[in-house]
């Protein structure tokens, strides 16, 4: 799902050398909780008599992408409480990586020094690519990212898995859905050319759109430093006769796009993917502008099947969970099921756990918040995306 400027770098280095560097900064000062203010984020189930199993979480809790990282952190924390049992008492700690690859590796090593036995993270794609390179080195630590969607995250690694759809999967499914339901529309493809999530979906969408005979009359792009106004791009799309926008972008720029279209009187349909989940919670956004918006996502807070999770999340964190939180929760669920499948003790060594959890992942089925999840030996998830339309401020299945 996520790239969000997760800056990458060459992470192939001795893990313990990075741990030593982190220790030099003072581990206690680095450990941060599930709030932008930081603090200890250790969590456990008060009802569990099981042995302690340590799960790490990494994501941006400060900076421009903080809302995504905080959701992931909260989802992991809540999952650790809910899935603890008489065998495993799940304890979590989280680290802030500011959506930066180098900082994410430092965070990973800090958690490894803490004794992390499995990682549910990082949040962003660039950070996940960097951390996956280190997690796959000996001594390995099992990693499942809730929200990074690039195939580069898992490629060539036996112990790295994903909870969310891959970018190609989203692009292909979106094109097929639009061909079946909006085949007469004229499309403008609108995406962030500097973002691997957005451009990855766009590339797959274009290929499938050609096969599905969708008419793309315009293609408009932007970059991270130009997200305050999209009037120029919309003007071009309108002049070329586009009647529908396909925009695999995040909810913050999507809110700007909808407002710009409204301000210029451009009546155009719009569809996004899972990164657009959360648009109704954008601060200062007139949510009436999102009426009729389509998005493809495996999670809806309005689905009655998710009511218990939504209530527990609201009670704990004072806000409605988004897909980032749900994916993180499902990530913890997957670790719990894989541990059970592998028959591992709570005090299992992280390196031993890594290979056995990876083997178990291809055998389990998780009935999660984001669907029924299974995994292949490439670490990619199989689950069905669902198209929703926003009506009266709620998600309704399209």
Q: What do these predicted ranges mean?
A:
Residues 34-46:
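Bacterial lipoprotein signal-peptidase II cleavage site
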Residues 49, 56-75, 83, 95-102, ...:
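Extracytoplasmic "Venus flytrap"
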Residues 61, 160-221, 244, 335:
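An alpha-beta-alpha
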Residues 40-43, 68-72, 82-154, 163, ...:
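Beta-alpha junction/loop-to-helix N-cap segments that form part of ligand/metal-binding clefts
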């Amino acid at each position: 799902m996520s790239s969000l400027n997760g800056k990458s770098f060459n992470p192939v280095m001795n893990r313990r050398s990075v741990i030593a560097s982190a220790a030099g900064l003072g581990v206690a000062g680095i450990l941060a909780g599930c709030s932008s203010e930081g603090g200890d984020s250790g969590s456990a189930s008060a009802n569990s008599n099981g042995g302690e199993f340590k799960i790490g979480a990494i994501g941006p809790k400060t900076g421009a992408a903080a809302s995504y990282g905080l959701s992931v952190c909260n989802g992991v924390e809540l999952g650790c409480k809910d899935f603890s049992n008489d065998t495993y008492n799940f304890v979590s700690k989280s680290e802030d990586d500011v959506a930066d690859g180098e900082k994410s590796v430092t965070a990973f090593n800090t958690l490894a020094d803490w004794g992390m036995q499995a990682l549910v993270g990082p949040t962003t794609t660039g950070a996940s690519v960097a951390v996956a390179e280190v997690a796959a080195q000996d001594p390995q630590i099992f990693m499942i990212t809730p929200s990074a969607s690039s195939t580069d995250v898992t490629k060539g690694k036996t112990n790295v898995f994903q909870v969310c759809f891959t970018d190609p999967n989203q692009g292909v499914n979106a094109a097929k859905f639009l061909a079946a339901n909006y085949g007469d529309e004229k499309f403008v493809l609108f995406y962030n050319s500097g973002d691997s999530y957005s451009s990855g979906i766009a590339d797959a969408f274009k290929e499938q759109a050609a096969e599905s005979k969708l008419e793309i009359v315009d293609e408009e792009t932007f970059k991270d430093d130009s997200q305050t106004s999209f009037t120029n791009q919309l003007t071009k799309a309108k002049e070329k006769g586009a009647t529908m926008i396909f925009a695999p972008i995040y909810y913050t720029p999507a809110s700007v796009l909808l407002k710009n279209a409204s301000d210029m009187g451009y009546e155009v349909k719009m569809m996004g993917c899972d990164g657009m989940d959360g648009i109704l919670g954008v601060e200062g956004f007139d949510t009436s502008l999102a009426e009729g918006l389509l998005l493809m996502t495996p999670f809806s807070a309005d689905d009655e099947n998710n009511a218990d999770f939504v209530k527990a999340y609201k009670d704990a964190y004072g806000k409605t969970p988004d897909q980032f939180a749900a994916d993180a929760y499902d990530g913890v669920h997957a670790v719990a099921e894989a541990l059970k499948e592998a028959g591992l003790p709570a005090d299992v060594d992280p390196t031993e756990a890594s290979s056995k959890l990876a083997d178990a992942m291809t055998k389990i089925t998780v009935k999660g918040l984001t669907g029924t999840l299974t995994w292949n030996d490439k670490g990619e998830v199989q689950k069905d995306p669902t198209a929703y339309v926003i009506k009266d401020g709620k998600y309704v299945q399209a």
